[in-house]
């Protein structure tokens, strides 16, 4: 997708959680470092950053003459991503993804929640008055770690964003449903 869309640089990478389906592409970020000659900042919860720096040591520590390609940043609540004169303010909040805490992100009036099956009450406050809600919707049937179609609809009805984008749709959910 990077090649097809002619993406030449990355300002940052934000990780929602440490599962392999979210993190395994980290190795593919090396060309951005090689081209731009500067570390790529990554952001995530302390749990996620700990897993990434442990599982992908070569990205964060010098080894065998290779420079680290990434700079790890632990997020707790509000943080900023800076590039030249521009600043992107981001709010991180907890969501539940099965047996772990994952992270949802709020960018002004856009919320992104990729993998979750429950949103704690204290995190819900971030989801009102949204222009866009990007929300997990894996299947029609119940799932132990993801919202299903009915869970997603309940959340949409509760927070009433102007527009919603369902993500993580599995093969049993037709994209034209």
Where are these regions (language model features)?
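Active-site metal-binding motif and surrounding structural segment of the metallo-beta-lactamase
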Residues: 1-44, 131-132
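Core dinuclear metal-dependent hydrolase active-site scaffold
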Residues: 1-5, 69-125
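Divalent metal-coordination and catalytic microenvironments
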Residues: 2, 17, 42, 52, ...
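Short, glycine/charged-enriched secondary-structure capping and boundary segments
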Residues: 6-7, 27-31, 56-59, 105, ...
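Structural motif
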Residues: 12, 109-112, 132, 163
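Hydrophobic/aromatic beta-strand patches that form the interior of the parallel beta-sheet core
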Residues: 14, 43, 73, 91, ...
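Active-site neighborhood of divalent metal-dependent phosphoester bond hydrolases
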Residues: 36-40, 48-72
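Cap/insert and terminal regions of metallo-dependent hydrolase folds
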Residues: 118-177
């Amino acid at each position: 997708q990077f090649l097809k869309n002619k993406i030449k640089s990355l300002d940052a990478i934000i990780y929602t959680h440490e599962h392999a389906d979210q993190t395994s592409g980290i190795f593919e970020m090396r060309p951005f470092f090689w081209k731009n000659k500067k570390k790529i900042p990554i952001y995530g919860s302390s749990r996620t950053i700990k897993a990434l720096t442990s599982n992908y040591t070569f990205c964060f520590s010098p080894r065998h003459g290779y420079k680290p390609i990434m700079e790890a940043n632990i997020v707790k609540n509000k943080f900023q991503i800076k590039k030249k004169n521009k600043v992107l303010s981001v709010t991180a909040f907890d969501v539940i993804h099965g047996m772990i805490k994952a992270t949802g992100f709020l960018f002004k009036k856009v919320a992104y929640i990729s993998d979750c099956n429950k949103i704690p009450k204290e995190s819900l406050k971030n989801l009102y008055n949204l222009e866009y809600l990007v929300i997990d919707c894996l299947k029609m049937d119940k799932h132990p770690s993801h919202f299903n179609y009915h869970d997603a609809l309940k959340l949409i009805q509760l927070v009433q964003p102007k527009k919603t984008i369902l993500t993580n749709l599995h093969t049993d959910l037709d994209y034209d449903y």
